Design a protein with these regions (language model features):
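Hydrophobic "anchor" residues on beta-strands that sit immediately upstream
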Residues: 75, 117, 156
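NTP-dependent small-molecule kinase module
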Residues: 125-178
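Hydrophobic residues at beta-strand termini and immediately following loops
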Residues: 11, 120, 159
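PAPS-dependent sulfotransferase catalytic domain
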Residues: 98-111, 140-152
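Conserved phosphate-donor/acceptor-positioning beta-strand/loop module used by diverse small-molecule
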Residues: 78-83, 101-103, 110-128
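ATP-dependent small-molecule kinase phosphotransfer cores
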Residues: 4-8, 12-94, 98-99
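Glycine-rich phosphate-binding P-loop
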Residues: 1
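Short, surface-exposed loop/helix-turn segments at secondary-structure junctions
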Residues: 94-102, 132-135
């Protein structure tokens, strides 16, 4: 059901580049949740409690899944690793990219140190076209801004994700295997 906030959306027209009921529902759901999260996470006690439980959950899930590889001294390649937890929660909390970066630094001791960070830069518009479960462009724009800030501030290796898959794959392999 489309929320009242989006009641004027016509179901058979494109919404943010996608067509139909599904995208209208995703937008409505995002708007509803964003409003609720904004109210809940304004309270610093709620933010702290939420982040504590999210970190504990992520910490145990991560270590259960990777401990055997770490103990065996194997190389591990992660997709977003623990950083995405901080990016998502930072968006929920309304934090600036700088504040998110500081939160990552504060809790990095909980996770293994990475040898390299490879940032595959893809515009929000391209991401939106590639996936059909993205809530809306606002969400992608926020994530993009944060990852751009993190990549520049931490001197990550950046690969242009707008290129054909084979070229992106080749560049990542070169970075990781060299």
């Amino acid at each position: 059901k489309v929320s009242d906030k989006n009641k004027n959306i016509k179901m058979n027209v494109q919404v943010d580049g996608k067509c139909g009921v599904k995208q209208a529902e995703l937008n409505a759901d995002y708007n509803t949740k964003a409003g609720l999260k904004g109210k809940i996470f304004r309270n610093p006690i709620m933010r702290g409690t939420w982040m504590f439980f999210a970190l504990v959950d992520y910490f145990f899930q991560f270590h259960i899944k990777t401990l055997s590889f770490i103990l065996a001294g194997k190389n591990i390649i992660f997709d977003r690793f623990y950083l995405d937890l901080f990016v998502d929660q930072g968006i929920n909390f309304g934090f600036s990219p700088d504040r998110i970066s500081k939160e990552i630094q504060k809790y990095r001791f909980l996770f293994p140190r990475m040898d390299n960070y490879v940032y595959i830069r893809v515009s929000p518009e391209t991401c939106y076209k590639r996936k059909n479960d993205i809530p809306n462009m606002d969400y992608l724009n926020k994530r993009y801004e944060i990852y751009e800030f993190l990549a520049k501030g931490n001197k990550w290796i950046t690969v242009d994700g707008e290129q054909p898959f084979e070229k992106v794959n080749s560049q990542i392999k070169k970075v990781v295997l060299d």
